[in-house]
């Protein structure tokens, strides 16, 4: 039975209802600082923690609950005679409920504050109390999440107590929270790219209907700190997002963020099927659609500019899962909303692409994101690309890095006319891209040509210029073919494998 509760919260959502309920059941309430003031001003009978400890707050509030008279009351095991004898001798009363939420370090670490100001939001007393209460969960109910208040109130109403299953779950939530909280602090202080221990701080954003396939359960977690496009987007219309939707949206958004020009990316199964740049939003959508008017069906379309009404009217002519853009004209949004299932996503954050992580069985691979497009760019053939061809070549390299290896992209006039990817050898990828393109002008490859066959195949289709990393022991074979066929070729010095 709960006779004594300690309440100290930063987030005061729902705390008055909880406190008044406890008061109605003759529970003695102890509180601190701002929480004490808030409860008292709202008519709750509350005891200042200083009356319990006999010691005032000190060090600008850094020390207020760190006291044996508090922690002894939390940690004492009620059916341990020695424990109860000791706290009675020391004048310590048991504390049966601890209601605490922490200083918002997750939020403050991203604000425009000095280092020392951010450090002040590292909570010490709160974590100490909730860890103690969680350890002694059989005797102490610990609440750290405002969403749990109602359930606990209902259990007490029905059973006059909180059952052991609920107590254990609430205790588990404490250590789950503290793992994330400590991880955020650790990463803030260490500032290491590859620390000895990899600690990640993510919070569940939403439960998903299922994962990649219907038989796979899934949920979506987002970083507790920082601003990221796949964390801070806003859904303006449509059904709930799925696991595959979020994965696809991430790649589509990263692709359009590569370009300063107006850009559009159509994507299906995590692979671009149409990418284009141009002068207007209508132009780039039309070009992206024309890249592959079959595969775009049921896919995702992303833009790096605001979507207008005319483009929206074209978008709803086909079945799409998602349209994502930095913003939408009001009349464009009204058009898109006529498709009630179409997910319309407003995403203002630019792609950060800091680290890539891949889970393997028993480990996590961590690497820098592929942010370097070119390095030692040089023309290696007798013929040089024209300025227009060079622009298309650079465009092609920005696209090919988002296509699964082996990857080839064929480009014409700022549009990816043919995309070949996910092949186990490069010539198959080249044939796929060239066949889809039909009449492309330039070709981009994510990695070097191991033989001269890709250059030979490119010549058959009238390709005028090629861009690739170079570095093969048989580079001269490809260079020779290009010189014989009148093709210019550029080496970049940077490979873009994607697996």
UniProtKB/Swiss-Prot annotation:
Q: Which GO terms describe its biological process?
A: 'de novo' IMP biosynthetic process
Q: Name one GO molecular function term.
A: phosphoribosylaminoimidazolecarboxamide formyltransferase activity
**What high-level taxonomic lineage is stated for the organism?**
Bacteria, Bacillati, Bacillota, Clostridia, Eubacteriales
Task: Kindly give the HAMAP family that the UniProt entry links to this protein.
Answer: PurH
EC number(s) from the headed UniProt entry: 2.1.2.3, 3.5.4.10
SMART domains named in the record: AICARFT_IMPCHas (SM00798), MGS (SM00851)
Q: What domain of life is recorded for the organism? A: Bacteria
The record's annotation in PROSITE patterns points to: MGS
What's the protein here called?
Answer: Bifunctional purine biosynthesis protein PurH
What does the comment on domains in this protein's record state?
A: The IMP cyclohydrolase activity resides in the N-terminal region.
Q: What are the UniProt keywords, alphabetically? A: Hydrolase, Multifunctional enzyme, Purine biosynthesis, Transferase
Q: Which PANTHER family match?
A: BIFUNCTIONAL PURINE BIOSYNTHESIS PROTEIN ATIC, BIFUNCTIONAL PURINE BIOSYNTHESIS PROTEIN PURH
Question: What pathway does the annotation place this protein in?
Answer: Purine metabolism; IMP biosynthesis via de novo pathway; 5-formamido-1-(5-phospho-D-ribosyl)imidazole-4-carboxamide from 5-amino-1-(5-phospho-D-ribosyl)imidazole-4-carboxamide (10-formyl THF route): step 1/1; Purine metabolism; IMP biosynthesis via de novo pathway; IMP from 5-formamido-1-(5-phospho-D-ribosyl)imidazole-4-carboxamide: step 1/1
